Amino acid sequence: MSEFKSAVKNELKPVKYRHFNRGVNKYSNALHCQLRIGRSFLKSHSFSINFSQDDLCLCNRPETTSHFLLNCFLFQLERESLLAKICQLYPPFSRKSMQQQTFILLNGINLENEVPDARNVQIFYAVQKFILQTKRFSKTFSNLFI
């Protein structure tokens, strides 16, 4: 009976990744989570729920999560230190597609392993440090969009 319960539990209850609750602080962890689930105050997320008139960044490109994390020239300096840290932790990162890189920054690496990859905590710290350094979600930056 216990084997049956274990099999059902493994099938119906997804594995919880412990690194999702780690970060610089609760605020940065919340921002990171919002980016992961597509409900942040980026213009594309706000536009999708009619909270914004358009989905364009200040650089006139759609302000998506991948644009914010990997492309927007407004955050180039902050991004350089983020990518240096990520490439140090996970060297194959630079050879991944933009979609895969975005997934890694939002979710971590080696999620299919039973034993969590310890580098995910460091990846999350680096991403959250980037989010805070950009000040993209501060009230001052948000006022530029009004």
What positions do the PLM features span?
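C-terminal functional segments of enzyme domains
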Residues: 1-16
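Family-specific functional microsites
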Residues: 3, 19-146
